[in-house]
Curated annotation (Swiss-Prot):
The entry's keywords: DNA-binding, Membrane, Metal-binding, Nucleus, Transcription, Transcription regulation, Transmembrane, Transmembrane helix, Virulence, Zinc
Keyword Zinc-finger: no
Lineage of origin: Eukaryota, Fungi, Dikarya, Ascomycota, Pezizomycotina
GO cellular component: membrane; nucleus
Protein name: ABC-transporter-regulating transcription factor
SMART domains: Fungal_trans, GAL4
Organism: Aspergillus oryzae (strain ATCC 42149 / RIB 40)
GO biological-process terms attached to the record: DNA-templated transcription; positive regulation of metabolic process
Changes seen on gene knockout: Results in a hypersensitivity to miconazole.
Record membrane topology: Single-pass membrane protein
Biased composition (Basic and acidic residues): 736-750
GO-annotated molecular function: DNA binding; DNA-binding transcription factor activity, RNA polymerase II-specific; zinc ion binding
Coiled coil: none
Low complexity bias locations: 175-189
DNA-binding region: 71-98
Length: 894
């Protein structure tokens, strides 16, 4: 009968009544036995009941515990022990002592522990995907599988009800109608009921389209906002959170419905017609401040029209700051007997004249002295700056502030641009540029121009934010204005392709790029981002890198970064060059965080390689150091597109090549044995020569100081390379010496020993060596791959490997060799080619104890150098006392 329940019985019939019987474990103990130890069945042996008095003795429990294990002699002879007391039968026969040795059996982990751990990891990844798809809410731990199953059932039930309503001929069977009638009736008249802690309605949780509900909510929010315009054309925006939102269209409509007349609406309209606000506010105090000073009169009409034509054809076509028909209408009025007297218009027309003069100087159409006229027109605009910020609330004032900011970006001091952009964005909030404004009653031309002006302010704000490390003014969570039109009727922003068959909207592309810059700062460098865990930050770096690469791939090949620029028009080339510079800077800023935290040397690399992360990891995060250095090289190569001379446009992009020089300088000090170190020094020299061409007069002290600093960087890098080359030759000589004593060979740095802190440095080492520790560390000849047992040593950014000729090379050099990078920058940065970069041949190295940083915290660029400010006007007095200055001489000996 033992086989019953496991198959057919003797007559060939299945026995289903026994299939669900609980299996008998460990020898088939009876269900009727007493609760407790499973040995109770064995202890009911009548042998123990034959001995008198055994049941009542105090040592009865101890004797029973000993029977669970045979005596030592029976175990040694591997015979069955009957457990009799005081001696078992075999011990009596052999006349030996009957000894029971108590041995505690260690419990091993269950065999399925690893399997369960794998299931948990897979389940975690599934939950992460479900959260991304909207099936799970973000409340961790509150949504279990039962709740999820209920939601799916409700959704399925709702879909069934909708299908039944669509097909009236569909009828239920009699058997199913009784079991599903209640659910079907409820589904036909209401949407599926959600729990109180359920996620918001999405495509996965509600049969209704989420876009419709989102549109309704946004439309209601727009209706609760108000944009009031007075008789002067000035507007005033009031948001929905304000206590005065009752003056919004929705609020006025509500009052009209409750009162039954329009008296409230008429009173509000008449009140705003007489709105003067600042016009006569404290005239005895601010009259002299608001007085308009003219530093240079406007040019004659013909000359002005020529300048305006240059502005709209060469500048406004890419940066649509003004609507040309509206602007030219005001120009005609300006040169009539009834000019428009608004301060916003006065500042705007002078800003356009200033930018037009500067464009002519940049194109070598006029002498350099013409730039003085540009500054005089700018002074005219700056003369009404107080009135623009304290008094005006019109679109022309925002445009004038942005125009002044764009002009002053071509100066050594970026502080005015910071202030002007911030003022422009705050003023744009006053007139509601950051909102869609569907209920403002504006015509399509006005709506499009408002979008363009806002996005110019937005991209300037985000560019300043990323380069200076200062928080942005515009909050991305409190704006819903769409991107500019991709193909507008006036063709603004469109650039023809080289084949003549297509076009590309450069302005819209720059606006999309600004949104990525905003995410980079917010998710990597803001105060909130610093609270992320290492794993979250690593995933964020991969996501931002992927989004940046998708943006780059959307650009036509003629203007795409990492490719030659195919444009002949000088102003257009400058716009594309700025686009390329910005891309490389953003790429470096993303991966700088990975390099600084040493993610590719941490345990997270092993964690990701084993597939334990919940989301697929971008493999480029383990190439962050290579990407930063390669982007720096590409940035310096863009200098050839910049006009030579002391032009204002140079200040727009001077940050990028100087920042790239600092990156190459730090990489050379960290990896002096890099195969491209010599070529990197030549690139540093290109930057130095570029700066030297800008020193045109004695008054340009900013360029001179920058030139001196960059020249010192180049000299130190050259000294470090010469020193590393001499040390490499001396190492090879010591290796080649056959008669060298064994004890001396063990002291050479070519073995896998870690030098002690008391080891002396070479006398010729530069003083900066302590700040930038070199990574030409000894090679571990005993290993052939990364030491995964110590993941903090694997994948070090400055890792030394054994080259093909036996000379130690850096990890970056090995990556260049394996990927066939060379000058093929596009292939290097392509995500599809990441598989060609292998880590299997890398040799981990020992970190010297004399370095102040561990391998986990050892970026190839020190953190202080990453924080180089955007402004050139540094406090040079403080820098001269704090910045390390090289004073040593290289060691001429081996």
């Amino acid at each position: 009968m033992d086989g019953m329940g496991e198959g057919p019985d003797g007559m060939g019939f299945d026995m289903p009544m026994l299939m669900n019987q609980q299996p008998h474990l460990f020898g088939g103990y009876s269900r009727d036995s007493s609760r407790g130890s499973p040995l109770n069945n064995v202890l009911s042996n009548p042998t123990y009941n034959e001995e008198p008095g055994m049941a009542g003795e105090d040592n009865n429990d101890a004797k029973r515990r000993r029977i669970a294990r045979a005596c030592d002699m029976c175990r040694k002879k591997k015979i069955k022990c009957d457990g009799k007391m005081p001696k078992c039968s075999h011990c009596i026969n052999y006349r030996t002592d009957c000894v029971f040795t108590q041995v505690e059996k260690k419990r091993n982990p269950p065999k399925g522990a690893k399997y369960i751990e794998g299931l948990e990891n897979r389940l975690g990844r599934m939950e992460s995907l479900l959260r991304l798809s909207g099936l799970l809410s973000e409340d961790d731990g509150k949504t279990d599988l039962g709740t999820l199953e209920k939601r799916l059932a409700d959704r399925s039930l709702g879909n069934t009800a909708l299908n039944s309503l669509k097909s009236p001929t569909n009828k239920f069977n009699g058997s199913s109608a009784t079991s599903q009638s209640q659910h079907t009736t409820a589904s036909r008249h209401s949407t599926p009921r959600m729990d109180s802690h359920s996620s918001p309605h999405t495509a996965a949780t509600s049969p209704n389209s989420p876009k419709e509900s989102e549109t309704e909510v946004e439309g209601l929010s727009d209706m609760m906002c108000s944009l009031v315009t007075n008789n002067c054309g000035e507007t005033r925006y009031i948001g929905s959170s304000s206590g005065f939102s009752i003056f919004s269209p929705k609020g006025i409509q509500w009052v009209n419905e409750k009162t039954g007349d329009t008296s409230f609406q008429e009173m509000i309209s008449s009140a705003y017609v007489d709105d003067n606000k600042w016009m006569y506010w404290k005239p005895e105090i601010f009259s002299d401040i608001f007085a308009r000073r003219v530093f240079k009169p406007l040019p004659p009409k013909e000359e002005a029209l020529s300048l305006f034509r240059d502005f709209f054809e060469n500048f406004n076509c890419m940066f649509p700051l003004f609507h040309e028909p509206t602007f030219m209408h005001l120009v005609e009025r300006q040169y009539s007997r009834d000019p428009y007297e608004g301060s916003g218009w006065w500042a705007s027309i002078n800003v356009v004249l200033a930018i037009a003069h500067r464009l002519r100087v940049m194109s070598n159409l006029v002498p350099q002295e013409e730039d003085k006229k540009a500054w005089l027109y700018l002074k005219n605009a700056m003369g009404v700056l107080t009135e623009l910020t304290m008094r005006n609330t019109d679109l022309l004032s925002v445009q004038a502030l942005l125009g002044m900011s764009l002009f002053l970006q071509g100066t050594p001091n970026p502080q005015p641009s910071f202030f002007l952009v911030a003022a422009a964005i705050r003023l744009s909030h006053s007139i509601g540029l950051h909102k869609r404004g569907s209920g403002f009653g504006l015509n399509p031309v006005e709506v499009e121009q408002r979008k363009r002006v806002f996005w110019i302010a937005y991209l300037l704000d985000k560019d300043i934010c990323l380069r200076s490390g200062r928080p942005p003014v515009q909050d991305d969570d409190d704006m819903n204005v769409e991107l500019p039109s991709e193909d507008p009727p006036d063709n603004i922003g469109n650039v023809p392709l080289s084949d003549g068959k297509g076009k590309f909207n450069l302005f819209r592309t720059l606006c999309r790029f600004a949104t990525i810059e905003s995410k980079v700062y917010k998710r990597l460098y803001s105060a909130k981002a610093s609270k992320q865990s290492d794993g979250e930050l690593l995933n964020t770096i991969g996501e931002l890198d992927r989004e940046l690469e998708e943006w780059k791939d959307s650009i036509p090949i003629d203007f795409r970064p990492e490719h030659e620029i195919k444009a002949s028009h000088t102003p257009l080339i400058l716009h594309v060059v700025v686009l390329h510079f910005s891309y490389y800077n953003c790429l470096t800023t993303i991966h700088r965080m990975s390099v600084h935290h040493g993610y590719w040397t941490s345990r997270l690399s092993n964690y990701a390689i084993q597939g334990l992360n919940a989301r697929p990891l971008n493999p480029r995060v383990f190439l962050s150091a290579v990407l930063c250095v390669t982007a720096a090289r590409a940035s310096i190569n863009l200098i050839k597109y910049i006009p030579h001379g002391d032009f204002a446009c140079v200040w727009l992009i001077l940050y990028y090549p100087v920042s790239a020089l600092v990156t190459l300088f730090a990489n050379i000090l960290q990896n002096p044995n890099d195969a491209r170190a010599r070529s990197d020094v030549k690139l540093m020299n290109v930057v130095v020569n570029f700066l030297s061409t800008l020193v045109s007069d004695e008054s340009n002290g900013s360029i001179k100081r920058m030139l001196g600093l960059c020249g010192e960087f180049e000299r130190i890098a050259q000294v470090v390379l010469d020193k590393a080359e001499k040390e490499s030759h001396s190492k090879k000589k010591r290796k080649a010496a056959p008669d060298e004593p064994q004890d001396l060979r063990q002291k050479t740095p070519d073995e896998n020993s870690v030098p002690s802190p008391s080891t002396k440095r070479p006398t010729g080492a530069p003083p900066t060596a302590t700040l930038f520790p070199s990574s030409s560390y000894p090679i571990n000849l005993g290993n052939t791959g990364p030491d995964m047992s110590n993941p903090t040593r694997a994948f070090a950014p400055g890792q030394t490997v054994l080259g093909t000729n036996g000379v130690p090379t850096s990890m970056q050099e090995s990556m260049h060799t394996m990927s066939g990078m060379g000058h093929d920058f596009p292939e290097m940065l392509s995500p599809n080619n990441m598989d060609s970069v292998g880590f299997g041949d890398q040799q981990p190295f020992g970190t010297p104890t004399e370095t102040p940083m561990t391998s986990f915290q050892q970026p190839f660029v020190p953190q202080d150098l990453w924080q180089m400010p955007m402004t050139i006007e540094w406090d040079w007095a403080d820098m001269s006392s704090n910045f390390p200055v090289f004073e040593g001489t290289p060691n001429t000996g081996p």
